[in-house]
Regions:
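Conserved catalytic or regulatory cores that recognize and/or transform ribose-phosphate-containing ligands
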Residues: 1-168
């Protein structure tokens, strides 16, 4: 039986990947889950290996850096390029993806631009994806939803769709 490679795109502030992984294991689905670097501080600082100019910690949101704007901007760009190398490789290798937009609390603050960008990368690479988000995001995510294999509101629905893809 084929083992399906499934890329998990989504916010890194909750444990949704662990939940999905435990559900995949419980259902004994032939799926290997992959994801970007989910350690927020490590992901933000990975560019420091190129030029450790920012040894002080990154400020907490809302990210008003003042006179350090340029320093943190270029730190972010360097880190993003390294992170994108991993992300693009995993996207190219995946059979399909789960694209999750979280809900509530601080997740509304982050707006999850990275997730939208990764959905665009999946589309550009002709990779099918299942999108997961609450009903209140239907309108803002209509372009992303229009290219999805399925729209799910919870991970039980995701598992049902994955069963149909991977076991039939």
């Amino acid at each position: 039986m084929k083992t399906w490679n499934v890329y998990c795109s989504g916010e890194i502030h909750t444990n949704w990947r662990k939940l999905l992984s435990s559900m995949v294991k419980a259902e004994q689905l032939p799926i290997e889950l992959t994801s970007p670097n989910c350690n927020h501080k490590e992901s933000d600082a990975v560019g420091d290996i190129l030029d450790p100019i920012c040894e002080e910690p990154i400020p907490e949101p809302p990210f008003h850096y003042g006179e350090n704007d340029k320093k943190y901007f270029f730190r972010g760009v360097k880190s993003a390029k390294i992170n994108q190398t991993r992300i693009q490789s995993l996207i190219k290798e995946c059979d399909f993806a789960i694209v999750t937009f979280g809900i509530g609390g601080e997740l509304d603050f982050y707006r999850q631009w990275n997730v939208a960008f990764e959905a665009g990368c999946l589309y550009a690479n002709n990779k099918p994806y299942i999108v997961v988000h609450p009903e209140k995001l239907i309108h803002p995510l209509k372009e992303i939803d229009s290219h999805a294999l399925a729209w799910c509101q919870n991970y039980e629905q995701v598992i049902s769709v994955m069963k149909s893809i991977c076991l039939k």
